[in-house]
């Protein structure tokens, strides 16, 4: 059956020629698309063609195109059936290990605390959370493995290295956007809210996460 007579006639539109391929690739890479920066054109395409695209992904790939919002900021992403499998589409969120999840929970907390403020963060802001926040002992235990008055330069460098690795992954997922990677300067995006949905049990029992991390590391 020719595409003009199919359920996917939207693929013949001029906008599909401009944006569909990039949008499709980006979604299948696990990215959350928001009206921000270079993703704005993809967001507009998804917004205008949401119903058609949702049918397309469910029919052909067995996955679901979701539209959600956080603080009235909308974002799009591909979701998977409960068995975690789609046809020819990899579940990128399964790449997250416990340390990624811990850092994601930290950023989610920061996002919520800064509800009416800019969500920009620098490394010194994160260090301040580790050292001075009300939850500092929890974060120190989760990130360093134990609570101490002082940490060695090597210990701090290792936490920073892991943080950079995690932030690079979160940038690919669309959960943060780099402003200046060389100085660990970034903005937390509305889609960080996905952490709350993917890892609700871990967030509810965050004080047990350190045990989980160390068990996985053995």
Language-model segment annotations:
Residues 45-53, 154-172:
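Short amphipathic alpha-helical interaction segments
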């Amino acid at each position: 059956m020719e595409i003009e007579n199919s359920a996917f006639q939207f693929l013949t539109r001029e906008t599909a020629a401009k944006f569909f391929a990039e949008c499709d690739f980006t979604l299948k890479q696990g990215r959350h698309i928001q009206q921000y920066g270079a993703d704005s054109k993809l967001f507009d395409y998804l917004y205008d063609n949401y119903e058609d695209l949702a049918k397309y992904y469910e029919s052909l790939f067995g996955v679901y195109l979701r539209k959600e919002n956080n603080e009235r900021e909308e974002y799009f992403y591909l979701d998977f059936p409960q068995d975690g499998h789609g046809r020819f589409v990899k579940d990128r969120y399964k790449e997250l290990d416990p340390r990624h999840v811990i850092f994601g929970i930290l950023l989610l907390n920061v996002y919520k605390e800064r509800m009416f403020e800019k969500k920009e963060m620098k490394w010194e802001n994160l260090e301040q959370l580790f050292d001075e926040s009300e939850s500092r002992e929890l974060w120190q235990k989760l990130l360093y493995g134990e609570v101490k008055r002082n940490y060695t330069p090597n210990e701090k460098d290792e936490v920073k290295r892991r943080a950079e690795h995690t932030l690079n992954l979160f940038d690919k997922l669309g959960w943060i956007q780099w402003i200046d990677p060389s100085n660990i300067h970034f903005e937390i995006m509305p889609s960080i809210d996905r952490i709350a949905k993917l890892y609700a049990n871990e967030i509810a029992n965050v004080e047990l996460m350190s045990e989980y991390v160390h068990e996985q590391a053995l």
